[in-house]
């Protein structure tokens, strides 16, 4: 029923970026790892923090690239190639400007929408775009020129609480994804209200 084998959370490395909106994807992987008692370990071979969890008797590889965001494909490609994981069996969690805080959506395929992490993954995966995305809403600052400062900035407390709630729900939905597939997980996640 489920074909996902690898879960990736995009981020920039280092303490100065840890709590910035751009690291929302990594927050998802950290929460998932904590829920399933997995300790993420740095693995230079895969250019990231790696681990594995068993959900509903299925193994999922976890990855948070420790490259900068615009080099995320290096880490994703390394792990996927080593374990022979096809692109459509990868789920990438990332911050999404076009969704409000408190909203998270699962989507298959698509473009990069200007997201440098997605852009690099697509480039390193021979232009294949069919991986799943977990889009975690961080809201939009209103003007294009303000986007960089926005994603590299920290959210207000109320927005952070909404994002945390959406991520928590997304983590719970991985159980549904493993048991009943993407569509059921999508239905549950897309009806969530923080």
UniProtKB/Swiss-Prot annotation:
Alphabetized GO MF terms: peptidyl-tRNA hydrolase activity; tRNA binding
Alphabetically, which GO biological process terms does the record hold?
protein quality control for misfolded or incompletely synthesized proteins; rescue of stalled ribosome
Question: Transmembrane segments in this chain: where?
Answer: none
Q: Which SUPFAM superfamilies match?
A: Peptidyl-tRNA hydrolase-like
The protein's location, in the record's own words, is: Cytoplasm
InterPro entries, per this entry? Pept_tRNA_hydro (IPR001328), Pept_tRNA_hydro_CS (IPR018171), Pept_tRNA_hydro_sf (IPR036416)
EC numbers on record: 3.1.1.29
Site entry (Stabilizes the basic form of H active site to accept a proton), positions = 95
Please list the reactions this protein catalyses. an N-acyl-L-alpha-aminoacyl-tRNA + H2O = an N-acyl-L-amino acid + a tRNA + H(+)
Locate the site labelled Discriminates between blocked and unblocked aminoacyl-tRNA.
12
Residues of the active site are: 22
Which Pfam families is this protein grouped with? Pept_tRNA_hydro
Q: Where does tRNA bind?
A: 17, 68, 70, 116
Q: Assembly and interactions?
A: Monomer.
HAMAP family the UniProt entry points to: Pept_tRNA_hydro_bact
* Job description of the protein: Hydrolyzes ribosome-free peptidyl-tRNAs (with 1 or more amino acids incorporated), which drop off the ribosome during protein synthesis, or as a result of ribosome stalling.
Record-linked PANTHER family: PEPTIDYL-TRNA HYDROLASE
Q: Which family does it belong to?
A: Belongs to the PTH family.
From the Swiss-Prot or TrEMBL record, give the protein name. Peptidyl-tRNA hydrolase
User: Native species of this protein?
Assistant: Pseudoalteromonas translucida (strain TAC 125)
């Amino acid at each position: 029923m489920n074909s996902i084998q690898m879960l990736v959370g995009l981020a920039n490395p280092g303490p100065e970026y840890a709590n910035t909106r751009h690291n929302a994807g990594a927050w998802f992987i950290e929460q998932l790892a904590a829920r399933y008692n997995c300790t993420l370990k740095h693995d230079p071979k895969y250019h990231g923090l790696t681990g594995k969890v068993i959900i509903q008797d299925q193994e999922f590889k976890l990855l948070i690239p420790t490259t900068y965001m615009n080099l995320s494909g290096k880490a994703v490609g390394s792990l996927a190639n080593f374990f022979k994981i096809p692109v459509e069996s990868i789920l990438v969690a990332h911050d999404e400007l076009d969704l409000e805080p408190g909203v998270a959506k699962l989507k298959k395929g698509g473009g990069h929408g200007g997201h440098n992490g997605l852009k690099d993954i697509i480039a390193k995966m021979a232009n294949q775009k069919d991986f799943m995305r977990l889009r975690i809403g961080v809201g939009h600052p209103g003007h294009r020129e303000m986007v960089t400062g926005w994603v590299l900035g920290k959210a207000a407390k109320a927005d952070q609480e909404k994002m945390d709630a959406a991520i928590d729900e997304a983590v719970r939905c991985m159980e549904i994804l493993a048991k009943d597939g993407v569509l059921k997980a999508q239905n549950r996640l897309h009806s969530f209200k923080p």
